[in-house]
Regions:
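Active-site donor-binding loop signature of nucleotide-sugar glycosyltransferases
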Residues: 25, 171, 242
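Short, charged beta-turn/beta-strand-edge "cap" motif at the junction between a beta-strand
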Residues: 43-47, 97-102, 246
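Local cysteine-cluster metal-coordination motifs and their immediate loop/turn environment
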Residues: 126, 205-206, 227-249
Length: 249
């Protein structure tokens, strides 16, 4: 874990209220794993004082495959992310990371069934890196991407560039299935019945609950990444606590 003052190296707007910030920091990049996040300051002043948690979107590598930087895929949801959207190349922010518990991904010596990535909204951010790592290890991957509208869909092109089959759902029916992303997932499981499938999910709480119910019903392993506001990023302040079967965690 490192605490660094970093210059923003790139800014790309990818949709309404959606943007990507790029940073160079070999120390953080070399330790990033799929599912890690960083805590990033949003203003030079103390208002707002708390940093915001952002999932690692992609790890940047040079010609020799050495990690040298990382990107964050961000959606404006409040004053903090709105301030980040106003940042320009060359602006500086404080970044603490990598933080969190990464996804537990199988290696090449344990090739399993199909890995199904289920995501909604900005919960899509960690999954291109998940897919990339699984594909490197020879695993089969399929993505289910949901959003309110076609404009709000994230990471679909990332998956297609990786050769990952993608099923899309939008609340308003403007692209793909008209409805919630769990319905294409359920339909796929019912029609294909993939043996030894593994589920991964990140997105709105109702979506996560629905994926959990599917996993429980079908006795499929499930890993989740929670979207939660937090103050410290390391579990000390307890603001990110969620209730699990074994108690709060």
């Amino acid at each position: 874990m490192y605490d660094r003052r970093l210059a923003i190296e790139s800014v790309a707007h990818v949709g309404p209220g959606q943007f990507i910030l790029g940073f160079e920091c070999p120390e953080i990049a070399s330790q990033c794993r799929p599912g890690h996040f960083v805590m990033i300051s949003v203003a030079e002043s103390i208002d707002p004082i708390l940093r915001r948690p952002m999932a690692i979107y992609r790890v940047l590598r040079d010609a020799s495959n050495t990690p040298y930087g990382f990107t964050l895929l961000i959606e404006v949801v409040g004053c903090g992310t709105a301030l980040l959207e106003q940042k320009s190349v060359g602006d500086h922010v404080e970044v603490l990371g990598p933080l969190g518990v990464p996804f537990s991904l199988p290696t090449t010596d344990r090739v399993s069934g199909e890995h199904l990535l289920v995501m909604g909204g900005v919960g899509s951010a960690p999954f291109p890196l998940v897919a990339e790592e699984l594909l490197k290890s020879g695993h089969r991957v399929r993505a289910f991407v949901g959003a309110r509208t076609a404009e709000a869909l994230l990471c679909v092109d990332d998956f297609r560039e990786l050769g990952v089959p993608v099923e899309v759902a939008t609340d308003d029916g403007s692209e793909g299935f008209h409805g919630y992303v769990v319905h294409p997932l359920q339909g796929y499981l019912e029609s294909e019945d993939p043996a030894n499938a593994v589920l991964y999910a990140c997105g709105p709480t109702p979506m996560m609950r629905a994926v959990h119910e599917i996993a429980m019903t079908r006795n499929l392993p499930l890993q989740v990444s929670f979207e939660a506001p937090m103050a410290c990023g390391i579990g000390v302040c307890l603001s990110c606590v969620v209730c699990v079967d074994a108690g709060d965690n």
